């Protein structure tokens, strides 16, 4: 029996456990962003490490909370630290900070994300990792933080890209390398259309 690739494993998991909420929203909270399948997430992290091998990555960056599991497994596979942007600056975060503004598609709110200056710097080569890529808001907010830190963006890795929401296209048009494990072309009529 041939082992399925991580992409095929993800697609199968989405088919079995994913739920289309609307033409724009896919619910995958049973394995990705509420309850987490750690074995699958480790395979996802290993796949991102494979795809970005040779990029001299020094940090993996994500936004709390849904991206943390994927980012952690990617950092583990790359053997580099993981930094997550906080959605609220804690009172314990002092010194220089880097901030970005993000509009959450599913929560319909605008939030300011923040990273302590001591965790990102000009010497860093950063890989952004997240669970979903839709409008690209989270990636753009994290890119602002990377720019403020004087660090270098290596690329963006996302588990699921909703291609019909054009965030990935906009990032690619800026010359940013985007690696999406699963690309979805449509959720219309409650049907998941995979592009890869």
Curated annotation (Swiss-Prot):
One of its GO terms (molecular function) is xanthine phosphoribosyltransferase activity. Homodimer. InterPro entries: PRibTrfase_dom, PRTase-like, Pur/Pyrimidine_PRTase, Xanthine_PRibTrfase. GO terms for cellular component: cytoplasm. The keyword Glycosyltransferase applies. Keywords: Cytoplasm, Glycosyltransferase, Purine salvage, Transferase. Its main location: cytoplasm. It catalyses: XMP + diphosphate = xanthine + 5-phospho-alpha-D-ribose 1-diphosphate. This is Xanthine phosphoribosyltransferase. Belongs to the purine/pyrimidine phosphoribosyltransferase family. Xpt subfamily. Converts the preformed base xanthine, a product of nucleic acid breakdown, to xanthosine 5'-monophosphate (XMP), so it can be reused for RNA or DNA synthesis. CDD domains: PRTases_typeI (cd06223). The keyword Cytoplasm applies. It is found in: Cytoplasm. Xanthine binds at residues 26, 33, 162. GO terms for biological process: purine ribonucleoside salvage; xanthine metabolic process; XMP salvage. 5-phospho-alpha-D-ribose 1-diphosphate binds at residues 134-138. Its EC number is 2.4.2.22.
């Amino acid at each position: 029996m041939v082992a399925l690739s991580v992409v095929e494993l993800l697609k199968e998991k989405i088919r079995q456990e994913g739920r289309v909420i609307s033409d724009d929203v896919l619910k995958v909270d049973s394995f990705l962003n509420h309850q987490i399948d750690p074995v699958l997430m480790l395979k996802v992290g290993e796949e991102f490490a494979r795809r970005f091998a040779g990029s001299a990555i020094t940090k993996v960056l994500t936004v709390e909370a849904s991206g943390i599991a994927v980012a952690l497994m990617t950092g583990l596979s790359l053997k580099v630290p993981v930094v997550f942007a906080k959605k609220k600056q804690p009172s314990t975060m002092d010194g220089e900070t880097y901030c970005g503004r993000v509009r959450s598609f599913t929560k319909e709110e605008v939030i300011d994300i923040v990273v302590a200056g001591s965790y990102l710097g000009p010497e860093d080569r950063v890989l952004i990792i997240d669970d979903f890529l839709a409008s690209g808001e989270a990636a753009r907010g994290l890119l602002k933080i990377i720019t403020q830190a004087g660090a270098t963006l290596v690329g963006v890795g996302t588990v699921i890209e909703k291609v019909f929401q054009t965030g990935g296209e906009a990032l690619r048009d800026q010359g940013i390398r985007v690696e999406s494990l699963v690309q979805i072309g449509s959720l219309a009529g409650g049907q998941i259309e995979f592009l890869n």
